[in-house]
Amino acid sequence: MGGKTNKILKGAFAGLVSAVLCLPLMAGCGGGAADYTNVIKLQDNQALLTNPDMGFNFTYYANTIYDFNNTLHPGDYLDDFPCDTIFFRIGWNWIEPEEGKFNWEFTDDIADEWIARGKNIAFCWVVTYPGDQSTPLWVKEAGAEGVQYAYTAESQTDGSVEYIMKPVMEDGTLGAGDQRFSNLPKDAQDYALNRGNRNDPAYNNGEEVTEGDYENYRGSWVVNYDDPVFLEKWENFLKAAGERYDDNPAVQFVEIGSFGDWGEGHNTNTRANSISQSTKRKHFELYLKYFENVQLMVNDDAIEGTELVSFTKENGIGLSDHSVQVPYAGGPAEGMTGNVAYASLYWRDLPVLLEHHNGTTFMETYYNAIVDCHATFARINCDPYVASLSEWKDMIARKLGYRLVFSEVRTTDIYAGAEVQIQFDMTNEGSAPCYAGGNPTFYLVDSLGRVHATAVSEFNVRDLSVADRGEEAESMTGTAVLQIPDALIDDDYYICVSVVRDENTSYNLPLDYQDGTRQRYQIATFTVGADE
């Protein structure tokens, strides 16, 4: 290497305030271990990133087979959000229409298209959808007990119609019910009364029904959630689902949906079906039995006010909250703002998922809820092309989950044979921790992409704190040591950085100059060549 020198490639990287690398083999070169002679300033490039175990998920099926897949443009996989997970909330009866005969292709055929593009899938198999059948009726025929419900319409003095779901009594009359779906416009009233959402494939053969026909009149039979026959059949379903999906790396999460309205763990519209704490725990245990690898999520309504918070946390079950923007009596126009109190019990160790109401007028409310609840996942629970969502999606994407940002890297002199001391500053500018963690890693790479030296920091990005709304993320400092080889051929060389989770996974970072398809980013460059 005698008679050769390293020269800086001036202006190679925008945003490098100072990258004055030491010229090798010159007198005085190679300062002390803490003599950081090179300072590299880095900036968040504001890119919209996807990363493992976080981000947007799109509701392809929302309890029924009609929303929101019918709004999705053909061939669009929502890369511009970016959305990397498609979510199926679908009635059990669609997947197991006959006992032991599974129609997995109903969702898998769609899922395969997304997986082929490097995306993920997620599920919530629903037992109860108020108004339409979700439990296959062969469960009832096998002896399970439950309650038949039907909707009735009551006209109000202002001309609106309020729909009330009531249990059908043994004598054919309707019992007391709870108000739901107030102030629907007239065209929606006719649809709700005469067509409904038809969640059952064999629902009245697709024909309109008449008032008083309680078996078909936009109602449903709801199983008792502690019924032993039901639990046996449901366990068989979960066993089959676990065998199919638990070892599939493309499955992002499974939401627990086997009790309560829409699988949300509450019985607001089906109060004749009680849900005890012991019943809830039994359902949780069944999911845990058959899903040992996939992240499980539970709705906040299923655990609120119970000792099940501790049970779910101890067993690694994350929190899902579907309340954002949901209107309520006497509340503000933007509706509910997210269950911050319960999210605070989970987010430091487990992911939080938020779902907004299917209206999208108040997307600022959604953004604030994501920040306040420190959400990892956010659902696109609407037509993905509505203007109000388009205005906020980029801002949400830059905040949702974790966002690992290097602000400065400092090094000692870099030359052949040097033991380069590296110090760096990082923040997590996202809303949630990077739960799986990872280690900042530095590389010496030549122009052909060959790695000549690697330095793995002991610093773990899992330890980066996240800020509350209105506050700045705390910067933390880590170190690494990069041993430069004694001999380097004439070439251009790059100092690159990445954050590595495991041998197969590195994170996307908001930096320019990515090293090919790898998650390595060039932050400085120099050449080895003959003296001029």
Task: State where each predicted segment sits.
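Bacterial N-terminal signal peptides that target proteins for export
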Residues: 3-16
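Sec-dependent signal peptide cleavage junction
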Residues: 23-35
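N-terminal substrate-binding region of glycoside hydrolase catalytic domains
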Residues: 35-229, 336-371, 375-388
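Short catalytic/ligand-binding loop motif for oxyanion handling, primarily in non-cytosolic enzymes
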Residues: 95-96, 129-138, 260-266, 304-307, ...
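Active-site cleft segment of glycoside hydrolase catalytic domains centered on the general acid/base Glu
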Residues: 188, 195, 200-251, 255-287, ...
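Substrate-binding cleft/loops of secretory-pathway carbohydrate-active enzymes
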Residues: 255-292, 297-343
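Extracellular/luminal regions of secreted and cell-surface proteins that mediate adhesion/ECM remodeling
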Residues: 398-532
